[in-house]
Amino acid sequence: MMGRDYALYFFAALGSFLVVYIVLPIVTIFAKQALDFEMLVKTVHDPLVLEALRNSLLTATATALISLFFGVPLGYILARKDFRGKNFVQAIIDVPVVIPHSVVGIMLLVTFSNAILDSYKGIIAAMLFVSAPFAINSARDGFLAVDEKLEHVARTLGASRIRTFFSISLPMALPSIASGGIMAWARSMSEVGAILIVAYYPKTAQILVMEYFNNYGLRASRPISVMLMLISLSIFVFLRWLIGRVRE
Amino acid sequence: MLKVESISKDYREFKLREISFDVREGEHFIILGPSGSGKTVLLEIIAGIISPDRGRILLRGEDITGLPPEKRNFSYIPQNYALFPHMTVFDNIAFGLKLRKIPRKEVARKVREVAESLGIDHLLHRKPRTLSGGEQQRVAIARALVVKPELLLMDEPFANLDVQTKSKLIREMKRWRKEFGFTAIHVTHSFEEALSLGDRVGIMLRGRLVQVGDVRDVFSKPKSEEVARFLGFENIIEGVANGRILKVGDLRIELPREVWGKVRVGIRPEDITIFMEGVKTSARNVFKARVEGIEDLGALVKLTLNLGGIILRAFITRSSLIELGIREGEEVYASFKASAIHVFP
């Protein structure tokens, strides 16, 4: 054996700072809420909270499906075709990541104004803008990982391009596409900035957390935060696990 | 049956130039060339996967250049076999049949039939990644043959297999050909495959098809120095083997192993030694030969020898040429060890 690899220990020590930094607030908020159980029970029975949670889950799910519906075909084109301006299209897809989300809200409102103002459409519009890149890029990576020769063989055996897509490319890229859908869903659930500007109503849980904090303070906003996190995390973890099993 | 007319194509680093040849019904046509010569691109143009910049492809006189792959009824087996990893072996083989709207019972029967012929009927429920290389290749061939294609397009079908599996599959390929009666275009860099399976061969070098013809003719009479250098094996003899003896005209050549029937053997020019008088050694093939040509290659000299009608080329050093005093038209003895003979199965 060689001597101890101190460099790796050093890196591990530095790296664990970030892991602890992410885990610590999550554990803390759950722990503190556990001590204040009464408030949690009260919140669970608050119809306003339940309504907001329902709104969040519905809009995020709708957004994930819409981003897949449009993102999967786009991902396929990006994976399979070379065309002029492809780099430009790829850059546009990544733009939402760099725009501050409040600015996204302003842009959407300037562009679509009353059509999306304070409506479910508005929530979904805001979510779609910030989450679509996840769906598109995962779909593209999924299709890139499918050997093009498989499609060629399917074609020579008599399958049209569309038939080949549905019987070969799509099933093989499905785990990657699904994980893109989950990321889009998770990104939608965590969106606040753009929704705040475009559609304060109908009220979503993310917005409600902020409203309770502004109006009633930390103690009132904490239980909703915990519930929102519990739901998001468990769905996220469950879906990831499901994909992992399918991949096996 | 298939006519390829002046196909040209620039594709990535490959440049195909003015490629023309034709394939006859029931023929096993080999496209032989080193890697990077553009063989795969040519095959994919014929399959309809890549469209050519110029030129036409005719199937029984009908122009199919613009047809998509699914309308050509050619089966394509890429070098990596491209088995569908998410389907069982059964579903892989059944893929083309299902697309042809054949009733399910009929599909199952046909799959079983072809799987039996190829010796893979015990693997039908398995997923491709659990199979060995040789088994995967059989599945790919079964999937291609079951749809009764007009043309079977094979890209380096044996390149990824170990030597034993390879020679076994080559032998079986001949049997399957009799059984299914397919016409094939087979792309390879292996002389062994060309000589064992090919009826005719096209030599492809740097994007051009430089010589097309009968396998034996191309190997024995390369049209250009380029082809000759690529083929390396200059002495290809065809004869009828009976155990360890190969009969070629009046000659009896001792072989390194037992073979029966029509075979081709190759001897490298550097493996032939020249004597002025016949020496009797049991382990050697010794034949009287007439020197028909002497070609100076620098340190080496290439002799063209006539062994009772069979032309062999031999390399000797310049000093032994002088020592032996060999001149054109003279009678010498050519000898080569049985172990220096390469038998093409």
Curated annotation (Swiss-Prot), chain A:
Lineage of the organism: Archaea, Methanobacteriati, Methanobacteriota, Thermococci, Thermococcales
Subunit composition and interactions: The complex is composed of two ATP-binding proteins (WtpC), two transmembrane proteins (WtpB) and a solute-binding protein (WtpA).
Listed InterPro entries: MetI-like, MetI-like_sf, Mo/W_ABC_Transporter_Permease
Parts of the chain that traverse the membrane: 10-30, 57-77, 92-112, 116-136, 165-185, 224-244
Organism: Pyrococcus horikoshii (strain ATCC 700860 / DSM 12428 / JCM 9974 / NBRC 100139 / OT-3)
Gene3D superfamilies hit by this protein: MetI-like (1.10.3720.10)
GO CC terms, sorted: plasma membrane
SUPFAM superfamilies attached to this UniProt entry: MetI-like (SSF161098)
Name listed for the protein in its UniProt record: Molybdate/tungstate transport system permease protein WtpB
Positions on the Extracellular side per record topology: 31-56, 113-115, 186-223
Protein family per UniProt: Belongs to the binding-protein-dependent transport system permease family.
Summary of the function given for this chain in its UniProt record: Part of the ABC transporter complex WtpABC involved in molybdate/tungstate import. Probably responsible for the translocation of the substrate across the membrane.
Membrane topology field: Multi-pass membrane protein
Residue ranges of every copy of the ABC transmembrane type-1 domain listed in the record: 53-239
From Swiss-Prot, chain B:
Keywords: ATP-binding, Cell membrane, Membrane, Molybdenum, Nucleotide-binding, Translocase, Transport
Documented EC number(s): 7.3.2.6
Reactions catalysed: tungstate(in) + ATP + H2O = tungstate(out) + ADP + phosphate + H(+)
Top-level EC class as recorded in UniProt: translocase
Residues reported to bind ATP: 33-40
Any single GO BP term: molybdate ion transport
InterPro entries, sorted: AAA+_ATPase, ABC_SmlMolc_Importer, ABC_transporter-like_ATP-bd, ABC_transporter-like_CS, Mo/tungstate-bd_C_term_dom, Molybdate/tungstate_ABC-ATPase, Mop_domain, P-loop_NTPase
Membrane topology reported for the UniProt record: Peripheral membrane protein
One family name in Pfam for this protein: TOBE
Location of the Mop domain: 280-345
Any one GO MF annotation of this record: ATP binding
Record-annotated ABC transporter domain positions: 2-231
One GO CC term, this protein: plasma membrane
Compartments where found: Cell membrane
Complex and partners: The complex is composed of two ATP-binding proteins (WtpC), two transmembrane proteins (WtpB) and a solute-binding protein (WtpA).
Record-stated family: Belongs to the ABC transporter superfamily. Sulfate/tungstate importer (TC 3.A.1.6) family.
Function: Part of the ABC transporter complex WtpABC involved in molybdate/tungstate import. Responsible for energy coupling to the transport system.
Name the UniProt record assigns to this protein: Molybdate/tungstate import ATP-binding protein WtpC
Species assigned in the record: Pyrococcus horikoshii (strain ATCC 700860 / DSM 12428 / JCM 9974 / NBRC 100139 / OT-3)
Source species taxonomy: Archaea, Methanobacteriati, Methanobacteriota, Thermococci, Thermococcales
Gene this chain is encoded by: wtpC
